[in-house]
Amino acid sequence: YVKVGELIGTRHGGFFDQPIHSTVSGYVVGFEKKVHSSGQTVDCLIVKNDKKYVLHESCVSRTDEEIAALTKDDYINIIKDSGLSGLGGSGFPTYIKLQTKHPIDVVVGNGVECEPNLISDYKLILERSHRIIEGLTYAMRATGAKKGIIAVKKKYPELFEVLENARHSFTEFDIEIKRVGNHYPQGWELDTIKHATGIEVPVGKLPAEYGVTVFNVATLYGFYRAVKRRMPITERFVTISGNGIK
């Protein structure tokens, strides 16, 4: 029997390992070959969902005192053990970004969805704005950045408002909510950096070389879950659209 958040395997990559956690509770009923989103056929552990979603015993919230005592290495290990990867589409392990040797001055939260029909981050910001800001503060602590920025489109004043209200709960941090353009591809990392910070990162260069690191707002929410609640990535907001929906 496995529980939500329980470690059930490890993905061994060419340059890094990623833990895999159960997203449901239930009994293991076997192994099967399945086609991964990458197109590769991989081994899968099959867990029969009992719909109870029983949390694993390890998923216990940290106190504010415990979080205040965390070091940079602690943050890296927490994020690594949570399996958190870029939720803006890259799927790149988040802990790798935290291991940069470059000094980071500013963390940018990307809340700009520029592909047609996508509104999952929009919905996440509306419903989890406080947690996103809290996740941003953890990312700032993990990188040593003194400045945090969350970028959203100008055409969504409601997103600016909820984030601005949430920001006031974290007055000890220098956090700014920036309204950027509505054009495509505003959500592209380098374009977001340019319009949110004024820093131009040349194509082919890493943002960290210019003192910037960027995380999607869903990834920042993942920071909150991992650091505060000791929860790995077991769920996310998704967009379903099209004429076939009934």
Label the predicted regions:
Residues 1-10, 30:
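Short, well-structured beta-strand-loop connectors
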Residues 11-23, 37-41, 55-57:
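Short, Lys/Arg- and Gly-enriched loop/turn segments at beta-strand edges
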Residues 26-28:
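Conserved hydrophobic positions within beta-strands
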Residues 30, 35-87, 92, 101, ...:
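Acidic low-complexity segments
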Residues 40, 58-60, 90, 97-98, ...:
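Short acidic, glycine/serine/threonine-rich loops at helix termini
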Residues 55-56, 107-121:
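Gly-rich Lys/Arg/Thr-decorated short loops/hinges at beta-loop-alpha junctions or inter-strand turns
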Residues 126-142:
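Histidine-anchored nucleotide/phosphate-binding helix
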Residues 146-246:
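Hydrophobic alpha-helical positions that pack around
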